[in-house]
A protein has these predicted regions:
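TRNA-recognition modules of translation machinery and tRNA-sensing kinases, especially anticodon-binding
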Residues: 1-263
């Protein structure tokens, strides 16, 4: 189905590259930034340690391969009458851009730094897809801040202000608002959502696309949730926080604004 993913034109591609360059340029020289190329595949073990199977299992996409035993029956036929799949490999498509960074940091002595990557991300969204704003596959520019609480909190506040300023170029109603993750609705997860909102752990940059409110960026304070699990907080001083910018939604915003894209 075409709303699961998007093929972009040359003009769209040019705008994506300009947009990503603009996002990266918002990081002041005071930040130590490492840029990484991250894969689309992720281990189920990493997802388990991150808590994904309990919080958002409905968003996950399992990677399967065709059952090789079927191929013997292919014979001279052009194709298999019925395709069966084997799911023995414990791999999934990456559901969140920052998740690969945590095992990379395991047992490292980490000081104040930023990890960043442009990542293809996959979320099933319960099958509720909309072209340009809610797809199965989409692209995210991710910034992960690692350091003491003051460093991470100030980084998140810095980027909130800067990305809101950019969004206001295309939508005069753009705003930052308190939010929570769309966890699978168990009783425990409902408590986690309330905890997130009450403690201001998540904010979103909201714009209007096709007359609907859409988040084009999220700002997340993790505390020591990941630094403890992945053993890079040996002195109880290291926390993390991330900023994710949904490239596809930004492109939809720019198109709707009917304004020439200028860096």
């Amino acid at each position: 189905m075409p709303d699961r993913y998007v093929e972009y034109s040359q003009n769209d591609y040019d705008n994506i590259m300009k947009l990503d360059t603009l996002f990266i340029s918002q990081l002041d020289s005071k930040y130590k930034v490492e840029y990484h190329k991250l894969p689309s595949l992720i281990s189920g073990e990493v997802l388990k340690r991150c808590g994904y199977f309990s919080t958002m299992p409905n968003q996950l996409s399992k990677v399967d391969i065709i059952d090789v035993s079927q191929l013997e029956s292919l014979g001279n036929n052009r194709e298999l009458e019925e395709i069966k799949y084997s799911s023995s490999e414990n791999y999934f498509l990456t559901p969140a851009a920052c998740l690969h960074f945590y095992p990379m940091l395991e047992h490292k002595e980490v000081k104040e730094c930023i990890y960043s990557s442009l990542v293809d991300v996959f979320r099933y969204e319960n099958g509720n897809f909309t072209m340009g704003t809610r797809q199965w596959e989409f692209t995210v520019r991710e910034f992960l801040a690692i350091g003491n609480p003051k460093f991470v909190e100030e980084f998140l506040e810095d980027l909130k202000e800067k990305f809101l300023t950019i969004a206001l170029r295309f939508d005069s109603t753009a705003k930052i608002q308190n939010a929570c993750d769309n966890f699978y609705p168990t009783n425990l997860n409902k408590v986690k959502q309330k905890f997130q909102k009450y403690n201001n752990l998540k904010f979103e940059l909201i714009v209007h696309i096709l007359e609907k409110e859409v988040s084009v960026a999220s700002f997340n304070y993790h505390n020591n949730h990941f630094s403890k699990e992945f053993n890079f907080d040996s002195n109880d001083t290291i926390v993390t926080g991330c900023v994710g910018l949904g490239i596809d939604r930004w492109i939809s915003l720019i198109k709707e604004s009917e304004k020439d894209y200028k860096l």
